[in-house]
Amino acid sequence: MKTLMRHGLAVCLALTTMCTSLLLVYSSLGGQKERPPQQQQQQQQQQQQASATGSSQPAAESSTQQRPGVPAGPRPLDGYLGVADHKPLKMHCRDCALVTSSGHLLHSRQGSQIDQTECVIRMNDAPTRGYGRDVGNRTSLRVIAHSSIQRILRNRHDLLNVSQGTVFIFWGPSSYMRRDGKGQVYNNLHLLSQVLPRLKAFMITRHKMLQFDELFKQETGKDRKISNTWLSTGWFTMTIALELCDRINVYGMVPPDFCRDPNHPSVPYHYYEPFGPDECTMYLSHERGRKGSHHRFITEKRVFKNWARTFNIHFFQPDWKPESLAINHPENKPVF
Protein backbone atom coordinates (compact mmCIF):
# COMPACT_ATOMS: atom_id res chain seq x y z
CA MET A 1 0.00 0.00 0.00
CA LYS A 2 2.84 2.38 0.85
CA THR A 3 4.39 1.70 -2.53
CA LEU A 4 1.11 2.45 -4.28
CA MET A 5 0.76 5.68 -2.27
CA ARG A 6 4.28 6.69 -3.21
CA HIS A 7 3.50 5.91 -6.84
CA GLY A 8 0.38 8.06 -6.67
CA LEU A 9 2.23 10.92 -5.00
CA ALA A 10 4.96 10.77 -7.62
CA VAL A 11 2.42 10.98 -10.40
CA CYS A 12 0.63 13.89 -8.72
CA LEU A 13 3.91 15.79 -8.34
CA ALA A 14 4.66 15.20 -12.00
CA LEU A 15 1.23 16.43 -13.00
CA THR A 16 1.65 19.68 -11.05
CA THR A 17 4.56 20.64 -13.28
CA MET A 18 2.97 19.44 -16.48
CA CYS A 19 1.01 22.63 -17.11
CA THR A 20 4.28 24.57 -17.11
CA SER A 21 5.70 22.10 -19.60
CA LEU A 22 2.64 22.47 -21.78
CA LEU A 23 3.07 26.24 -21.82
CA LEU A 24 6.63 25.67 -23.00
CA VAL A 25 5.27 23.39 -25.70
CA TYR A 26 2.91 26.13 -26.80
CA SER A 27 5.67 28.71 -26.98
CA SER A 28 8.15 26.45 -28.77
CA LEU A 29 5.90 24.33 -30.97
CA GLY A 30 2.70 26.28 -31.26
CA GLY A 31 4.23 28.55 -33.85
CA GLN A 32 6.41 25.91 -35.43
CA LYS A 33 6.25 25.92 -39.20
CA GLU A 34 4.70 22.85 -40.73
CA ARG A 35 6.50 20.93 -43.41
CA PRO A 36 5.23 21.91 -46.87
CA PRO A 37 2.83 19.41 -48.45
CA GLN A 38 5.32 18.76 -51.27
CA GLN A 39 7.96 17.61 -48.79
CA GLN A 40 5.42 15.44 -46.99
CA GLN A 41 4.47 13.81 -50.29
CA GLN A 42 8.12 13.16 -51.14
CA GLN A 43 8.69 11.59 -47.73
CA GLN A 44 5.65 9.33 -48.14
CA GLN A 45 6.87 8.25 -51.59
CA GLN A 46 10.29 7.41 -50.19
CA GLN A 47 8.74 5.31 -47.42
CA GLN A 48 6.53 3.48 -49.90
CA GLN A 49 9.53 2.77 -52.14
CA ALA A 50 11.51 1.48 -49.17
CA SER A 51 8.68 -0.88 -48.23
CA ALA A 52 8.39 -2.11 -51.82
CA THR A 53 12.10 -2.88 -52.19
CA GLY A 54 12.01 -5.40 -49.33
CA SER A 55 15.07 -6.58 -47.40
CA SER A 56 17.12 -9.60 -46.44
CA GLN A 57 14.46 -10.48 -43.88
CA PRO A 58 11.21 -12.13 -45.06
CA ALA A 59 8.53 -9.85 -46.44
CA ALA A 60 5.18 -9.35 -44.79
CA GLU A 61 2.85 -12.33 -44.85
CA SER A 62 -0.82 -11.43 -44.96
CA SER A 63 -3.57 -13.93 -44.21
CA THR A 64 -5.85 -12.34 -46.81
CA GLN A 65 -5.30 -10.88 -50.27
CA GLN A 66 -6.94 -7.65 -51.38
CA ARG A 67 -9.10 -8.12 -54.47
CA PRO A 68 -8.18 -5.90 -57.45
CA GLY A 69 -10.32 -2.80 -57.66
CA VAL A 70 -11.41 -2.94 -54.02
CA PRO A 71 -9.96 -0.04 -52.01
CA ALA A 72 -8.06 -1.13 -48.94
CA GLY A 73 -8.77 0.73 -45.75
CA PRO A 74 -7.94 0.01 -42.12
CA ARG A 75 -10.87 -0.90 -39.93
CA PRO A 76 -11.58 1.01 -36.72
CA LEU A 77 -9.90 -0.52 -33.68
CA ASP A 78 -12.00 -0.68 -30.54
CA GLY A 79 -10.50 0.69 -27.34
CA TYR A 80 -8.28 3.43 -28.79
CA LEU A 81 -9.98 6.84 -28.86
CA GLY A 82 -8.67 10.11 -30.24
CA VAL A 83 -7.95 12.57 -27.45
CA ALA A 84 -9.32 15.51 -29.43
CA ASP A 85 -12.27 14.01 -31.32
CA HIS A 86 -12.89 10.68 -29.51
CA LYS A 87 -12.87 8.86 -32.85
CA PRO A 88 -11.46 5.31 -32.95
CA LEU A 89 -7.98 4.62 -34.26
CA LYS A 90 -7.81 3.37 -37.85
CA MET A 91 -4.45 1.82 -38.65
CA HIS A 92 -3.15 -1.31 -40.34
CA CYS A 93 0.34 -2.36 -41.44
CA ARG A 94 1.52 -5.31 -43.48
CA ASP A 95 4.80 -5.48 -41.60
CA CYS A 96 6.01 -3.73 -38.47
CA ALA A 97 9.31 -3.19 -36.70
CA LEU A 98 8.73 -3.17 -32.96
CA VAL A 99 11.85 -1.46 -31.61
CA THR A 100 12.46 -2.08 -27.92
CA SER A 101 14.55 0.21 -25.73
CA SER A 102 17.09 -2.50 -24.91
CA GLY A 103 20.83 -1.95 -24.76
CA HIS A 104 21.18 -4.91 -27.13
CA LEU A 105 20.50 -2.45 -29.94
CA LEU A 106 23.70 -0.49 -29.30
CA HIS A 107 26.22 -0.99 -32.13
CA SER A 108 23.72 -3.27 -33.91
CA ARG A 109 23.54 -1.25 -37.15
CA GLN A 110 19.92 -2.32 -37.56
CA GLY A 111 18.72 1.20 -38.33
CA SER A 112 18.47 0.93 -42.11
CA GLN A 113 16.69 -2.42 -41.84
CA ILE A 114 14.20 -0.96 -39.35
CA ASP A 115 13.52 2.11 -41.49
CA GLN A 116 12.68 -0.07 -44.51
CA THR A 117 9.72 -1.55 -42.62
CA GLU A 118 6.28 -0.17 -43.44
CA CYS A 119 5.48 0.77 -39.82
CA VAL A 120 7.99 1.40 -37.03
CA ILE A 121 6.76 1.13 -33.43
CA ARG A 122 8.61 2.62 -30.45
CA MET A 123 7.93 2.98 -26.74
CA ASN A 124 7.83 5.85 -24.27
CA ASP A 125 10.61 8.40 -24.73
CA ALA A 126 13.09 6.18 -26.59
CA PRO A 127 14.96 8.61 -28.90
CA THR A 128 16.15 8.22 -32.46
CA ARG A 129 18.39 11.31 -32.68
CA GLY A 130 21.98 10.17 -32.26
CA TYR A 131 21.02 6.48 -32.47
CA GLY A 132 19.66 6.26 -36.00
CA ARG A 133 22.34 3.86 -37.22
CA ASP A 134 21.25 1.32 -34.60
CA VAL A 135 17.51 1.95 -34.11
CA GLY A 136 16.43 3.81 -37.25
CA ASN A 137 14.95 7.27 -37.65
CA ARG A 138 11.31 6.73 -38.58
CA THR A 139 8.45 6.37 -36.10
CA SER A 140 4.94 5.39 -37.17
CA LEU A 141 3.52 4.61 -33.72
CA ARG A 142 4.72 5.41 -30.22
CA VAL A 143 3.09 3.77 -27.19
CA ILE A 144 3.52 5.90 -24.07
CA ALA A 145 2.89 5.22 -20.37
CA HIS A 146 1.30 7.93 -18.25
CA SER A 147 4.49 8.01 -16.17
CA SER A 148 6.57 8.95 -19.23
CA ILE A 149 4.61 12.02 -20.31
CA GLN A 150 6.93 14.45 -18.52
CA ARG A 151 9.97 13.00 -20.29
CA ILE A 152 8.10 13.22 -23.59
CA LEU A 153 7.46 16.91 -22.98
CA ARG A 154 11.09 17.56 -22.06
CA ASN A 155 12.14 16.07 -25.41
CA ARG A 156 9.18 17.47 -27.33
CA HIS A 157 11.23 18.85 -30.24
CA ASP A 158 12.28 15.31 -31.20
CA LEU A 159 9.45 13.14 -29.90
CA LEU A 160 6.43 15.33 -30.75
CA ASN A 161 7.50 16.12 -34.30
CA VAL A 162 4.12 16.16 -36.05
CA SER A 163 5.70 16.32 -39.53
CA GLN A 164 6.33 12.55 -39.41
CA GLY A 165 2.63 11.80 -38.94
CA THR A 166 3.40 9.64 -35.92
CA VAL A 167 0.47 8.13 -34.01
CA PHE A 168 0.73 8.34 -30.21
CA ILE A 169 -1.16 5.93 -27.94
CA PHE A 170 -1.18 6.84 -24.24
CA TRP A 171 -2.09 4.37 -21.51
CA GLY A 172 -2.62 4.79 -17.79
CA PRO A 173 -4.83 3.90 -14.82
CA SER A 174 -8.48 4.70 -15.46
CA SER A 175 -8.54 7.28 -12.66
CA TYR A 176 -5.93 9.35 -14.53
CA MET A 177 -7.60 8.96 -17.94
CA ARG A 178 -11.17 9.93 -17.00
CA ARG A 179 -12.91 12.25 -19.45
CA ASP A 180 -15.25 13.86 -16.92
CA GLY A 181 -12.80 16.59 -15.94
CA LYS A 182 -11.25 14.57 -13.10
CA GLY A 183 -8.69 12.65 -15.13
CA GLN A 184 -5.52 14.68 -14.67
CA VAL A 185 -3.50 12.94 -17.38
CA TYR A 186 -6.36 13.08 -19.87
CA ASN A 187 -6.91 16.78 -19.14
CA ASN A 188 -3.29 17.54 -19.95
CA LEU A 189 -3.37 15.38 -23.08
CA HIS A 190 -6.46 17.23 -24.23
CA LEU A 191 -4.68 20.55 -23.66
CA LEU A 192 -1.68 19.24 -25.58
CA SER A 193 -3.90 18.27 -28.51
CA GLN A 194 -5.27 21.81 -28.57
CA VAL A 195 -1.76 23.27 -28.61
CA LEU A 196 -0.73 20.83 -31.35
CA PRO A 197 -3.90 20.20 -33.38
CA ARG A 198 -2.06 17.98 -35.88
CA LEU A 199 -0.86 15.65 -33.13
CA LYS A 200 -2.39 12.19 -33.61
CA ALA A 201 -2.93 11.39 -29.95
CA PHE A 202 -5.04 8.45 -28.77
CA MET A 203 -5.79 6.98 -25.37
CA ILE A 204 -6.65 3.45 -24.26
CA THR A 205 -10.17 3.29 -22.85
CA ARG A 206 -11.02 1.91 -19.42
CA HIS A 207 -12.78 -1.10 -20.95
CA LYS A 208 -9.75 -1.88 -23.09
CA MET A 209 -7.46 -1.63 -20.06
CA LEU A 210 -9.59 -4.26 -18.31
CA GLN A 211 -9.22 -6.46 -21.38
CA PHE A 212 -5.44 -6.15 -21.20
CA ASP A 213 -5.65 -7.31 -17.56
CA GLU A 214 -7.87 -10.24 -18.51
CA LEU A 215 -5.50 -11.22 -21.33
CA PHE A 216 -2.60 -11.31 -18.85
CA LYS A 217 -4.63 -13.60 -16.58
CA GLN A 218 -5.61 -15.90 -19.45
CA GLU A 219 -2.03 -16.24 -20.68
CA THR A 220 -0.26 -16.56 -17.31
CA GLY A 221 -2.89 -17.84 -14.89
CA LYS A 222 -2.08 -14.88 -12.62
CA ASP A 223 -4.41 -12.10 -11.63
CA ARG A 224 -2.60 -8.82 -12.23
CA LYS A 225 -3.83 -7.10 -9.07
CA ILE A 226 -3.52 -10.07 -6.73
CA SER A 227 0.04 -10.71 -7.94
CA ASN A 228 0.98 -7.03 -7.45
CA THR A 229 1.83 -6.67 -11.11
CA TRP A 230 2.03 -3.55 -13.27
CA LEU A 231 1.78 -4.44 -16.94
CA SER A 232 4.75 -3.01 -18.81
CA THR A 233 4.58 -0.72 -21.82
CA GLY A 234 6.07 -3.66 -23.72
CA TRP A 235 2.98 -5.73 -22.92
CA PHE A 236 0.67 -3.06 -24.29
CA THR A 237 2.88 -2.48 -27.32
CA MET A 238 3.16 -6.13 -28.34
CA THR A 239 -0.58 -6.67 -28.00
CA ILE A 240 -1.37 -3.50 -29.95
CA ALA A 241 1.07 -4.62 -32.65
CA LEU A 242 -0.82 -7.90 -32.98
CA GLU A 243 -3.95 -5.90 -33.71
CA LEU A 244 -2.24 -3.60 -36.23
CA CYS A 245 0.31 -5.75 -38.03
CA ASP A 246 0.32 -8.83 -40.25
CA ARG A 247 3.97 -9.45 -39.42
CA ILE A 248 6.02 -8.19 -36.46
CA ASN A 249 9.82 -7.99 -36.39
CA VAL A 250 10.90 -7.37 -32.79
CA TYR A 251 14.31 -5.77 -32.28
CA GLY A 252 16.22 -6.01 -29.01
CA MET A 253 14.05 -8.46 -27.05
CA VAL A 254 15.83 -11.37 -25.36
CA PRO A 255 14.26 -14.82 -24.83
CA PRO A 256 12.75 -15.41 -21.38
CA ASP A 257 15.58 -17.66 -20.18
CA PHE A 258 18.35 -15.29 -21.32
CA CYS A 259 19.19 -13.95 -17.86
CA ARG A 260 19.54 -17.45 -16.38
CA ASP A 261 22.77 -17.96 -18.29
CA PRO A 262 25.60 -16.94 -15.93
CA ASN A 263 27.65 -15.90 -18.97
CA HIS A 264 25.04 -13.63 -20.51
CA PRO A 265 26.42 -10.32 -21.79
CA SER A 266 25.76 -7.28 -19.66
CA VAL A 267 23.90 -4.49 -21.48
CA PRO A 268 22.12 -1.38 -20.20
CA TYR A 269 18.37 -1.57 -19.61
CA HIS A 270 17.91 1.33 -22.07
CA TYR A 271 20.16 1.90 -25.09
CA TYR A 272 19.94 5.66 -24.51
CA GLU A 273 21.12 5.34 -20.88
CA PRO A 274 24.48 3.58 -21.31
CA PHE A 275 25.40 4.09 -17.65
CA GLY A 276 21.98 3.11 -16.36
CA PRO A 277 20.99 -0.15 -14.67
CA ASP A 278 21.87 -3.53 -16.15
CA GLU A 279 19.04 -5.10 -18.14
CA CYS A 280 19.05 -8.53 -16.49
CA THR A 281 19.40 -6.99 -13.04
CA MET A 282 16.27 -4.96 -13.73
CA TYR A 283 14.38 -7.94 -15.13
CA LEU A 284 15.22 -10.26 -12.24
CA SER A 285 14.52 -7.73 -9.49
CA HIS A 286 11.07 -7.01 -10.89
CA GLU A 287 10.28 -10.67 -11.56
CA ARG A 288 11.18 -11.71 -8.01
CA GLY A 289 9.66 -8.71 -6.24
CA ARG A 290 6.70 -9.48 -3.99
CA LYS A 291 6.17 -6.33 -1.93
CA GLY A 292 4.73 -3.40 -3.81
CA SER A 293 3.98 -3.51 -7.52
CA HIS A 294 6.42 -4.72 -10.15
CA HIS A 295 6.64 -5.39 -13.86
CA ARG A 296 6.90 -9.09 -14.67
CA PHE A 297 9.23 -8.69 -17.62
CA ILE A 298 10.28 -12.35 -17.82
CA THR A 299 6.72 -13.64 -17.45
CA GLU A 300 5.64 -11.34 -20.27
CA LYS A 301 8.47 -12.61 -22.47
CA ARG A 302 7.31 -16.19 -21.91
CA VAL A 303 3.92 -15.15 -23.28
CA PHE A 304 5.51 -13.41 -26.28
CA LYS A 305 7.59 -16.52 -26.97
CA ASN A 306 4.45 -18.62 -26.89
CA TRP A 307 2.62 -16.24 -29.24
CA ALA A 308 5.53 -16.40 -31.69
CA ARG A 309 4.96 -20.14 -32.11
CA THR A 310 1.73 -19.40 -33.94
CA PHE A 311 1.62 -15.76 -34.91
CA ASN A 312 3.87 -13.95 -37.37
CA ILE A 313 6.35 -12.65 -34.77
CA HIS A 314 10.13 -12.76 -35.30
CA PHE A 315 12.98 -11.70 -33.00
CA PHE A 316 16.21 -9.96 -34.00
CA GLN A 317 19.17 -8.52 -32.10
CA PRO A 318 19.53 -11.01 -30.54
CA ASP A 319 18.20 -13.37 -33.21
CA TRP A 320 16.19 -16.24 -31.78
CA LYS A 321 13.01 -18.20 -32.35
CA PRO A 322 10.97 -20.41 -30.03
CA GLU A 323 11.28 -24.16 -30.24
CA SER A 324 8.32 -26.03 -31.70
CA LEU A 325 5.80 -27.74 -29.46
CA ALA A 326 3.68 -30.78 -30.20
CA ILE A 327 0.54 -28.93 -29.09
CA ASN A 328 -0.26 -25.90 -31.19
CA HIS A 329 -1.31 -22.58 -29.71
CA PRO A 330 -4.85 -21.47 -30.70
CA GLU A 331 -4.78 -19.75 -34.08
CA ASN A 332 -6.77 -16.71 -32.96
CA LYS A 333 -4.80 -13.61 -32.06
CA PRO A 334 -5.04 -12.82 -28.33
CA VAL A 335 -7.10 -9.67 -28.77
CA PHE A 336 -10.67 -8.78 -27.92
Curated annotation (Swiss-Prot):
Sugar attachment sites: 137, 161
Stored InterPro entries: Glyco_trans_29, GT29-like_sf, Sialyl_trans
Pathway where this protein functions: Glycolipid biosynthesis
Disulfide bonds: 96-245
UniProt keyword Phosphoprotein, yes or no: no
Chain segments annotated as transmembrane: 9-29
Compositional bias ranges of the Polar residues kind: 50-67
Ranges of Low complexity composition bias in the record: 38-49
Membrane topology of the entry: Single-pass type II membrane protein
This enzyme's EC code(s): 2.4.99.-
Any GO CC annotation of this UniProt entry: Golgi membrane
Keyword annotations from UniProtKB, A to Z: Disulfide bond, Glycoprotein, Glycosyltransferase, Golgi apparatus, Lipid metabolism, Membrane, Sialic acid, Signal-anchor, Transferase, Transmembrane, Transmembrane helix
Subcellular localization, as worded in the UniProt entry: Golgi apparatus membrane
UniProt superkingdom: Eukaryota
Lumenal topological domain: 30-336
Residue ranges of the region described as Disordered: 32-81
Single GO BP term: ganglioside biosynthetic process
GO molecular function, one term: sialyltransferase activity
Cytoplasmic side of membrane: 1-8
The reaction(s) this protein catalyses: a ganglioside GM1b (d18:1(4E)) + CMP-N-acetyl-beta-neuraminate = a ganglioside GD1alpha (d18:1(4E)) + CMP + H(+); N-acetyl-alpha-neuraminosyl-(2->3)-beta-D-galactosyl-(1->3)-N-acetyl-beta-D-glucosaminyl-(1->3)-beta-D-galactosyl-(1->4)-beta-D-glucosyl-(1<->1')-N-acyl-sphing-4-enine + CMP-N-acetyl-beta-neuraminate = N-acetyl-alpha-neuraminosyl-(2->3)-beta-D-galactosyl-(1->3)-[N-acetyl-alpha-neuraminosyl-(2->6)]-N-acetyl-beta-D-glucosaminyl-(1->3)-beta-D-galactosyl-(1->4)-beta-D-glucosyl-(1<->1')-N-acyl-sphing-4-enine + CMP + H(+)
Function, in words: Predominantly catalyzes the biosynthesis of ganglioside GD1alpha from GM1b in the brain, by transferring the sialyl group (N-acetyl-alpha-neuraminyl or NeuAc) from CMP-NeuAc to the GalNAc residue on the NeuAc-alpha-2,3-Gal-beta-1,3-GalNAc sequence of GM1b. GD1alpha is a critical molecule in the communication and interaction between neuronal cells and their supportive cells, particularly in brain tissues, and functions as an adhesion molecule in the process of metastasis.
Protein family per UniProt: Belongs to the glycosyltransferase 29 family.
Protein name, UniProt field: Alpha-N-acetylgalactosaminide alpha-2,6-sialyltransferase 5
Gene: ST6GALNAC5
